[in-house]
Amino acid sequence: MEPGRRGAAALLALLCVACALRAGRAQYERYSFRSFPRDELMPLESAYRHALDKYSGEHWAESVGYLEISLRLHRLLRDSEAFCHRNCSAAPQPEPAAGLASYPELRLFGGLLRRAHCLKRCKQGLPAFRQSQPSREVLADFQRREPYKFLQFAYFKANNLPKAIAAAHTFLLKHPDDEMMKRNMAYYKSLPGAEDYIKDLETKSYESLFIRAVRAYNGENWRTSITDMELALPDFFKAFYECLAACEGSREIKDFKDFYLSIADHYVEVLECKIQCEENLTPVIGGYPVEKFVATMYHYLQFAYYKLNDLKNAAPCAVSYLLFDQNDKVMQQNLVYYQYHRDTWGLSDEHFQPRPEAVQFFNVTTLQKELYDFAKENIMDDDEGEVVEYVDDLLELEETS
């Protein structure tokens, strides 16, 4: 949007519209994973491409309609992936056949085949997988919130300023340095009542809970802060593991490679998606992402529990925090304090163990990063190293190494 191209009369008209318009229906209001509207079921990529075609032709209402549908279809696909992977992960694994203990490779691939069978059966029953699957480029657009860039301008041209403001804000949270959108938002903020419509259309419930918990914390309402923060933690972990599951969706295989290299390439691509989940799910508050979000939640919790003299809950939160920031001097001192008063407060060794969900999250993210770094250094195509042409050269390299 280029505000400089409009005259004073147009600006006056827009100000009147801003006063008169109410916030419209959110694009996810009709969304339901269990009962998605049949009239909206279509391939995600087709809906998105059609929306962009209508956008290019300046058919704003149709563009808005199909952009909103494509956002719902994308959420349906992600939720469907997460649903199947979550259920198949929880499915009990049969005991290996007698004698297989000596064949770890067969056991490994046996588990993979059973998992594939479970996923195939699950996906056959879900409407999201009865459509042709989108390309990785389209999925990347949705991950980057690109549809909101187009929605913002289409809403504006359709005289729906409340939604245009929300779409601009939603896009800016992922692209805080986008100059055009920053200018658009500056213009919107100059309109009366604009602040009422500045909202993240992709916000997660744990973000609202976290903000409420911090506000209660700052107001020294310790119990309220603890209640909301203890709700935010599992809600974030749920979103995180669903994000991991969604990364295991369909992939386009183009290269012709050896069996193990092909599997490794596929898994590295999945890992690349998974290691971005934590960053992508981190709340952005005041234009800045919350640094070390999971650790920060444990930091707030340990102090709030301490203020209520509940050291049996404060100590595990302190130890959990130190998983993510081992060199934090303040938290180390807190832990020394808790250890010193352990008899007074009836603390045992189990109170100085990190919470199980923190250990699981730490282990998963750490191992994923280690695997990805190994693959990046040793397997990925950018780092193929020296090409060996003859067996003698290979033997010589092995001897020198």
UniProtKB/Swiss-Prot annotation:
Pfam families referenced in this protein's UniProt entry, alphabetically: TPR_leprecan
Top-level division of the source organism's lineage: Eukaryota
Gene Ontology terms: biological process: chaperone-mediated protein folding; collagen fibril organization; negative regulation of post-translational protein modification; protein stabilization; spermatogenesis
Name of the protein in its database record: Cartilage-associated protein
Tissue specificity comment: Found in articular chondrocytes. Expressed in a variety of tissues.
Keywords: Disease variant, Dwarfism, Extracellular matrix, Glycoprotein, Hydroxylation, Osteogenesis imperfecta, Secreted, Signal
Protein's gene: CRTAP
Subcellular location field: Secreted, Extracellular space, Extracellular matrix
